[in-house]
Amino acid sequence: MGPIGKATTRALLAGVLGAALPGAALAQFEAPKGAPAGTFGTPGQPTARLSYQYAYGMESPFTYRRNKDLDNGLRDNSLLFKTKVFGSITYRPTDWLAATLEMKLGREYAIREEQQIQLPSGDIRLPPRREPTLLVEQALITVRQVIAPFEINLGRRNYEDDRHWVFDGSMDVASLSYRHENVRAEAMVARDVLWSLDALRHSNKARIESAMVYADYRGFDNQVLAAYVLKRNDLSGNEGRPLMLGLRGHGKPSAAFSWWAEAAWLRGHDENGNRFRAHGLDVGATYRFADLPFDPNITLAYANGSGDGNPGDGVNTEFRQTGLQTNEAKYIGLSKFKAYGETLDSELSNLRVMTLGLGARAAPGVSLDLVYHRYRLNAYASEIRNWALTAQMNTLAGQQSKDVGQALDLVVGFRGLFGVRRLGLDLRAGVFMPGQAFRTADGNLANTAGRRADRGASVIAKFRY
């Protein structure tokens, strides 16, 4: 993302900005051990430790949303613009100590937005205050080699996984990680926001504590298997004390085939003291026709988060994700997108999602993805947890349905725009076609079947440098 030192510009670039858990996160602050032949230096000569490195970048997304309430008769369309500039620096005074600071300056602007919106529930929603922020994304001390093969991390750290299904964001942590040959592991305790680290305004501290143990094995050819235990404790009482047990894997056993799998079991207690007994699953595979022009590919995926059809029995069987996820992924294309649909943009909770994706590379720096989703509830409900819509389902007496609807997304990724290597553009457009669960009254008492809800849509254009 930017120039780094002298002869080893590219060697640690991915480590500065890519903090995947636990892979890139564990390697995020590791100096290169040596340079491969023909890459960064003379064969057989070790690369010198870099005492510092830095990176910078920018993202500027335009976000348009239409009909979040799925009713053309109510005005709730919005067009927002957000600019983000970030920079990071890592300093290594010795081989065993590293300090990293990453900050992000951002502000969101409303180009078009209603000053007051009445939601289908009857509530009145006002637009939020939008002020500039200067956030500390990472402020981390790393100690290694002192108790090798263990590593100690203390401070604010960014965690991500490939599909953003478990983690995508920063937490204030104390962690101990282990790395030896094909095994990597990490144990940590954390608070979502322990310190208010916004230089321009006060940010509320998040009263959610986490404890996690994560381990993966990489002894297979281009494949990873992992397991984790994550305990969350919301001290404010809003989210309860969930305990998640997870198994996951992903890989690319050949140039043509790639796959992923997520399986999680939810235990612990919810905010009402009910026991969690829920499960979630997300599996998929992509096949690439490498011998054909434009590298066409096809993806099939299935996701299922259990629901709770009997909420009064003292057992909550509705699956919830970690609360740290954003569910963004990509298949073979250049751009990430919302894995469960751009317009719905929901958590995997009380929901089944069937997905078919078709992709191609129109040019070396241009990718296309067309993604279709089919949604269905596991238990009757009026809404889906943490979705982007404001509409309500199953409001007609005697007309309940589990048919949520369908969605179609188009994702176009550009890299190296106008010959500028670092300049990119992501275009993501989605339309949601509501199903029978969204039928609403049309004002005609004789029409007990009601009317179909209107379509919703979203468009995001994100420039990146």
Each language-model region and where it sits:
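Cleavable N-terminal export/targeting peptides
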Residues: 1-35
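Beta-barrel outer-membrane channel/assembly domains of diderm bacteria
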Residues: 27-152, 174, 178, 247-259, ...
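Active-site beta-loop-alpha junctions enriched in small/polar residues
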Residues: 59-61, 104-106, 190-192, 230-234, ...
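Outer-membrane beta-barrel proteins
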Residues: 74-77, 161-170, 203, 266-278, ...
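Surface-exposed coil loops of outer-membrane beta-barrel proteins
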Residues: 112-138, 144-247, 314-357
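Transmembrane beta-strand segments of outer-membrane beta-barrel domains in Gram-negative
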Residues: 218-280, 284
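Acidic/polar loop patches that form or flank catalytic/metal-binding clefts of enzymes
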Residues: 224-226, 258-260, 290-301, 308-312
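A surface-exposed, glycine/aromatic-enriched loop/edge motif typical of exported proteins
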Residues: 299-325, 383
